[in-house]
């Protein structure tokens, strides 16, 4: 399994495109995968978007912090919860 960790802070507009592109690439690999979105205390509707994606796609898992703890804490939470044999961290804006 491949785990993709995506720390997110105010990324509601980026998440649908990220999900679409990441899913396209991951499906092409032919391995089981999961996408872990970590909401780092976003002030916009990032959490709502994560919930919607998780409802649509069983490969999506999300975790949410009560406040902003920083990217490193979000990455650590992702590493602690990733189930994959291979783990990568990506920015939600696809950079």
Regions found by a protein language model. Name each.
Residues 1-95:
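Structured catalytic core of nucleotide-sugar glycosyltransferases
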